[in-house]
Amino acid sequence: CALPICARTAHFTEMVRPYWGANTRRSLVQLLTSALPFFALWYAMLRSLEVGYWLTLLLAVPAAAFLMRLFMIQHDCGHGSFFHSRAARDGVGFCIGVLTLVPYDYWRRTHAYHHAHSGNLDFRGFGDIDTLTVREYKALGRWGQIGYRAYRHPLVLFLIGPAFHFLVKHRYPWDIP
């Protein structure tokens, strides 16, 4: 694109302006079309135990998808974009947090901090994946480098890390800003 950065930014801003702010009607539709199927699947899973665990596990797949959709609504509540009312956002976010096992207020504050400082090497160590500069990496000893490389391995980043984050860190928020 040959446009200067400020012109591209202005163009982008105008392009997304219609999507700014909350639309209460649309938000309620999204909430209902996420929560009702989730609870229906939850009930069906409970009833399916009489048939067999295989059916319960099969129903768990779409239930997990609807739970993920509910987490996305919780995310939008945390960003202040789902309802105009702060009380409505916080109420819905809290209730969904009970279902997703993600404490809403803690997550909202730490996620806002993450967005404010993500990618800024002067504000590392909270809400992000630890990142070292080349100079910092080279200054580590052999075991430090091995540990850092193990930490950055996809198995750790995408399996062990999220499990630790959701099962431990959300239960013991010792590093909340």
Locations of regions flagged by a protein language model:
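Post-HEXXH active-site segment of zinc metalloproteases
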Residues: 84-98, 126-131
